[in-house]
UniProtKB/Swiss-Prot annotation:
Core component of RNA polymerase II (Pol II), a DNA-dependent RNA polymerase which synthesizes mRNA precursors and many functional non-coding RNAs using the four ribonucleoside triphosphates as substrates. GO terms for molecular function: DNA binding; DNA-directed RNA polymerase activity; protein dimerization activity. Residues 203-226 are annotated as: Disordered. It is found in: Nucleus. InterPro entries: DNA-dir_RNA_pol_30-40kDasu_CS (IPR001514), DNA-dir_RNA_pol_insert (IPR011262), DNA-dir_RNA_pol_RpoA/D/Rpb3 (IPR011263), RBP11-like (IPR036603), RNAP_Rpo3/Rpb3/RPAC1 (IPR022842), RNApol_insert_sf (IPR036643), Rpo3/RPB3_RNA_Pol_subunit (IPR050518). One of its GO terms (biological process) is transcription by RNA polymerase II. This is DNA-directed RNA polymerase II subunit RPB3. SMART domains: RPOLD. SUPFAM superfamilies: Insert subdomain of RNA polymerase alpha subunit, RBP11-like subunits of RNA polymerase. GO terms for cellular component: cytoplasm; nucleoplasm; nucleus; RNA polymerase II, core complex.
Length: 275
């Protein structure tokens, strides 16, 4: 078997926003499965239900609701404790399966009033817009991080609403995608020729390239197979990047375990039927 050894992982960079790591001794199918799990199977919290009580802005209600759903919310401290709303015993919403937000803004000045994620008031200090995190403790921490614009109001216009954030994952809707981007490459020097460059010498080199400065791509390797994968996982801010990776691998492991259990039951049932 070409990949009989256990896969190995090496982290090359870890910041507040992204993590870069290398996985070796595996194949392309496994590597791509991991990438897809990062995007679609890691649960976070996002606004899913909106009741608009007053809206005299230029945007229709559905535009407002859509924008609210895409505002990333901090989920690190609560996502594992919150139930999915479909599994909760409550009739609509409760603290066990949701977080309530309110917004009440009216423009009384001649100057345009920007309604942003900062105006969203949460009933839980653990679930707030990512851009509002740590503002109360140190207002200088996020000076360069602008609040997310929802709508602009002119004098006399108002927006008043109530919303509930729920737990979900990216396979249901993009607002539950914890990543801003997930990328991996496996042939930094293009030795496999899976990519054809019109002018290789003009193409920017990968940060993982091992070629000399005067070389544009490696010699063609017709028998080569991808077995080393360079990942870059960027978080949208809802979860720390390392939390995304660990949660994704845990979810993938559970899926494989459930599949193994189900297959074992099927095999035992067939054996009993034959006997």
């Amino acid at each position: 078997m070409p990949y009989a050894n256990q896969p190995t992982v090496r982290i090359t960079e870890l910041t507040e926003e992204n993590v870069k790591f290398i996985i070796e001794n595996t194949d392309l199918a496994v590597a791509n499965s991991i990438r897809r799990v990062f995007i679609a199977e890691v649960p976070i919290i996002a606004i899913d239900w909106v009741q608009i009580d007053a809206n005299s802005s230029v945007l229709h209600d559905e535009f407002i609701a859509h924008r609210l759903g895409l505002i990333p919310l901090t989920s690190d401290d609560i996502v594992d404790k919150l139930q999915y709303s479909r599994d909760c015993t409550c009739e609509e919403f409760c603290p066990e399966c949701s977080v309530e937000f309110t917004l009440d803004v009216r423009c009384n000045e001649d100057q345009t009033r920007h309604v942003t994620s900062r105006d969203l008031i949460s009933n839980s200090p653990r679930v707030i817009p990512v851009t509002s995190r740590n503002r109360d403790n140190d207002p200088n921490d996020y000076v360069e991080q602008d609040d997310i614009l929802i709508v602009k109001l002119r004098k006399g216009q108002e927006l008043r609403l109530r919303a509930y954030a729920k737990k979900g994952f990216g396979k249901e809707h993009a607002k539950w995608n914890p990543t801003a981007g997930v990328a991996f490459e496996y042939d930094p020097d293009n030795a496999l020729r899976h990519t054809v460059y019109p002018k290789p010498e003009e193409w920017p080199k990968s940060e993982y390239s091992e070629l000399d400065e005067d070389e544009s791509q490696a010699p063609y390797d017709p028998n080569g197979k991808p077995e080393r994968f360079y990942y870059n996982v960027e978080s949208c801010g809802s979860l720390r990047p390392e939390t995304i990776v660990l949660s994704a691998l845990s979810g993938l492991k559970k899926k494989l375990s459930d599949l193994q259990t189900q297959l074992s039951h099927e095999i035992q049932s067939d054996v009993l039927t034959i006997n």
